[in-house]
Amino acid sequence: MPGVIPSESNGLSRGSPSKKNRLSLKFFQKKETKRALDFTDSQENEEKASEYRASEIDQVVPAAQSSPINCEKRENLLPFVGLNNLGNTCYLNSILQVLYFCPGFKSGVKHLFNIISRKKEALKDEANQKDKGNCKEDSLASYELICSLQSLIISVEQLQASFLLNPEKYTDELATQPRRLLNTLRELNPMYEGYLQHDAQEVLQCILGNIQETCQLLKKEEVKNVAELPTKVEEIPHPKEEMNGINSIEMDSMRHSEDFKEKLPKGNGKRKSDTEFGNMKKKVKLSKEHQSLEENQRQTRSKRKATSDTLESPPKIIPKYISENESPRPSQKKSRVKINWLKSATKQPSILSKFCSLGKITTNQGVKGQSKENECDPEEDLGKCESDNTTNGCGLESPGNTVTPVNVNEVKPINKGEEQIGFELVEKLFQGQLVLRTRCLECESLTERREDFQDISVPVQEDELSKVEESSEISPEPKTEMKTLRWAISQFASVERIVGEDKYFCENCHHYTEAERSLLFDKMPEVITIHLKCFAASGLEFDCYGGGLSKINTPLLTPLKLSLEEWSTKPTNDSYGLFAVVMHSGITISSGHYTASVKVTDLNSLELDKGNFVVDQMCEIGKPEPLNEEEARGVVENYNDEEVSIRVGGNTQPSKVLNKKNVEAIGLLGGQKSKADYELYNKASNPDKVASTAFAENRNSETSDTTGTHESDRNKESSDQTGINISGFENKISYVVQSLKEYEGKWLLFDDSEVKVTEEKDFLNSLSPSTSPTSTPYLLFYKKL
């Protein structure tokens, strides 16, 4: 029996593997858990992982060799700012780059922005007037394009100056985002919403058209303000003159009291105040005050109260006139208006008096206390317009004052100056005038019609080419001769013969005759924009690209210098030089890519000259600018182009302004460089505290000269310290100017955020290629030399 048991145990042990096979799934799961708890396997896995990590480290080490590439990129970075593509916005970026380098455009936008900022400050002062508020909110919306352009110019110049002073901070690209301007364009024209491709010429016309409308609106408001000046009379008399005026009032009131009682019944005066307009209300009201002054000597207290109540009711009609003058000043005006009203009492007020009153405005001249003032009186103006016998302007003079009439025409030259140039920004730079002449072939009479233009659309191939293609069965693309830009302009200004059914009706001959029609240039702008008609309607094979407008890749020989004397109405010696080109690469108008090539010819237009930097540094150190809420929206009210470099190396207050602008609003820098630029201004703010405090100590010590020798020594030390800082800053400016002069006369290729330098030979080859490439010039910009 005991021998049987081992045999059974052996059998069981041998039979156990069969059970394992039957329960293999569960047993393998338990076995996997045991293996997971085994440390020997984990050690082997760690050894394998360490070997794998070592192999990875060996592979990562060669990747560190990419640093020389970054160094090369940093060395290849140019001190010119590109524009980030915000979704098929290459059409906008190319136009903005051309406008930025257009001579006179930045200064004109800056001047318009200063006018708008002053108007905004004036609107803040008049915010309590609810009637005018609704009208001027719409005008403020039209000003947004100027503000957006100015903020973009500021951001570009600020980024350019920061790169020139600290080039090691930028390794990838030098670009900013025109997001605010794009949003403004989308508000002005909903066509630009979304991310579709648009025509560069259309967006140029949209920008210039809105700028022109804004200039016209500003000009109308300026003329309106000049016309409203006569209604706002300001008087600042000397105290002695006030006493003389009061004495004259008492004498005149005693002298003319009986005349007032006879010629001015109470009922008529009250009715005039209810029915008449303008200054007649004021005259009747003042005449009542004269009566009250005379009767107060004999009236009781109750009567005085009653008359005072009647006198307090008219100010509700004209609160502004009363609030602007103090108590002695209206009294000084009472005698003057009273005598004038008596002088012209027989005349009825007419519409002519309202127009005559517009010819006078208030002037405040003289030295210190002396004042010269004009008062507008409709009756006196009417008498002046009818008889021309009055020589002292409006009204009689009081003993202490001299009245001098000032005409509106005499004030216009004062307001013209820079503002008139700013209001005509588009007209002066881009707008010219064409003359359409029609000559009758029978009587040789001429008729002319003038039209304004902002660009010239010229063909790039002959119109008969399509007919040749239809009739030709040999080649679908027949070879044509190379055309030139002068040929294209001659086609634009060609002489057209009107014959057949399109005959011209001559007013001299009184019947339809044959005629010749020509188009000539009468007035030429500073910048001529030539639009090459590279897109034409074609077959259905291009409908899939949208619009059915295919690209004409016919090359056109474009000269660097151009003269339009041949097509001008009068002889001229003006010549134009090519300074910018917008290129288009693609096959249709709704697809492809736009780039801009600009020639750097005038570095002074970049506002980076040495004098402006030093002056702005002294101003910035002495007077730091406050931080306003509007600056968070990207518009700096007191900011100008000359403060670009000082923002980088100036005091701490403007650096805060820039930090807030970079973080919150317009996103001056695109992509990763906003953080780097933010850190740049924070690091640059510490050394500026020393200069600002030193300059403050210098000014404080100068005001107190009797404070002792210690303060004088401190003054010398602080002045020496500021002198060292300024001299070091001048060295930086000279280095910046010298570095920019290297690019004088070179062509820059702006491909959105990328900026490259192209040789003149390569540029001419791309401008006038020998073959028919897909990249062809689309807009040519010539400036007057």
From Swiss-Prot:
<feature type="site" description="Cleavage; by autolysis">
    <location>
        <begin position="671"/>
        <end position="672"/>
    </location>
</feature>
<feature type="compositionally biased region" description="Polar residues">
    <location>
        <begin position="7"/>
        <end position="16"/>
    </location>
</feature>
<dbReference type="GO" id="GO:0005829">
    <property type="term" value="C:cytosol"/>
</dbReference>
<feature type="region of interest" description="Disordered">
    <location>
        <begin position="1"/>
        <end position="21"/>
    </location>
</feature>
<dbReference type="InterPro" id="IPR038765">
    <property type="entry name" value="Papain-like_cys_pep_sf"/>
</dbReference>
<feature type="active site" description="Proton acceptor">
    <location>
        <position position="593"/>
    </location>
</feature>
<dbReference type="GO" id="GO:0031647">
    <property type="term" value="P:regulation of protein stability"/>
</dbReference>
<feature type="modified residue" description="Phosphoserine">
    <location>
        <position position="67"/>
    </location>
</feature>
<dbReference type="GO" id="GO:0046427">
    <property type="term" value="P:positive regulation of receptor signaling pathway via JAK-STAT"/>
</dbReference>
<keyword id="KW-0597">Phosphoprotein</keyword>
<dbReference type="GO" id="GO:0004197">
    <property type="term" value="F:cysteine-type endopeptidase activity"/>
</dbReference>
<feature type="modified residue" description="Phosphoserine">
    <location>
        <position position="768"/>
    </location>
</feature>
<dbReference type="GO" id="GO:0004843">
    <property type="term" value="F:cysteine-type deubiquitinase activity"/>
</dbReference>
<keyword id="KW-0068">Autocatalytic cleavage</keyword>
<feature type="domain" description="USP">
    <location>
        <begin position="81"/>
        <end position="785"/>
    </location>
</feature>
<feature type="region of interest" description="Disordered">
    <location>
        <begin position="693"/>
        <end position="723"/>
    </location>
</feature>
<feature type="modified residue" description="Phosphoserine">
    <location>
        <position position="313"/>
    </location>
</feature>
<comment type="similarity">
    <text>Belongs to the peptidase C19 family.</text>
</comment>
<dbReference type="InterPro" id="IPR028889">
    <property type="entry name" value="USP_dom"/>
</dbReference>
<dbReference type="GO" id="GO:1904333">
    <property type="term" value="P:positive regulation of error-prone translesion synthesis"/>
</dbReference>
<feature type="region of interest" description="Disordered">
    <location>
        <begin position="258"/>
        <end position="336"/>
    </location>
</feature>
<protein>
    <recommendedName>
        <fullName>Ubiquitin carboxyl-terminal hydrolase 1</fullName>
        <ecNumber>3.4.19.12</ecNumber>
    </recommendedName>
</protein>
<comment type="subunit">
    <text>Interacts with FANCD2 and PCNA. Interacts with WDR48. Interacts with ATAD5; the interaction regulates USP1-mediated PCNA deubiquitination.</text>
</comment>
<dbReference type="InterPro" id="IPR033815">
    <property type="entry name" value="USP1"/>
</dbReference>
<dbReference type="InterPro" id="IPR050164">
    <property type="entry name" value="Peptidase_C19"/>
</dbReference>
<feature type="active site" description="Nucleophile">
    <location>
        <position position="90"/>
    </location>
</feature>
<dbReference type="InterPro" id="IPR018200">
    <property type="entry name" value="USP_CS"/>
</dbReference>
<feature type="compositionally biased region" description="Basic and acidic residues">
    <location>
        <begin position="286"/>
        <end position="298"/>
    </location>
</feature>
<feature type="modified residue" description="Phosphoserine">
    <location>
        <position position="42"/>
    </location>
</feature>
<dbReference type="GO" id="GO:0008233">
    <property type="term" value="F:peptidase activity"/>
</dbReference>
<dbReference type="GO" id="GO:0005654">
    <property type="term" value="C:nucleoplasm"/>
</dbReference>
<feature type="compositionally biased region" description="Basic and acidic residues">
    <location>
        <begin position="708"/>
        <end position="719"/>
    </location>
</feature>
<keyword id="KW-0234">DNA repair</keyword>
<feature type="compositionally biased region" description="Basic and acidic residues">
    <location>
        <begin position="258"/>
        <end position="275"/>
    </location>
</feature>
<dbReference type="Pfam" id="PF00443">
    <property type="entry name" value="UCH"/>
</dbReference>
<keyword id="KW-0227">DNA damage</keyword>
<keyword id="KW-0539">Nucleus</keyword>
<dbReference type="GO" id="GO:0005634">
    <property type="term" value="C:nucleus"/>
</dbReference>
<keyword id="KW-0645">Protease</keyword>
<keyword id="KW-0833">Ubl conjugation pathway</keyword>
<feature type="region of interest" description="Disordered">
    <location>
        <begin position="33"/>
        <end position="52"/>
    </location>
</feature>
<dbReference type="GO" id="GO:0035520">
    <property type="term" value="P:monoubiquitinated protein deubiquitination"/>
</dbReference>
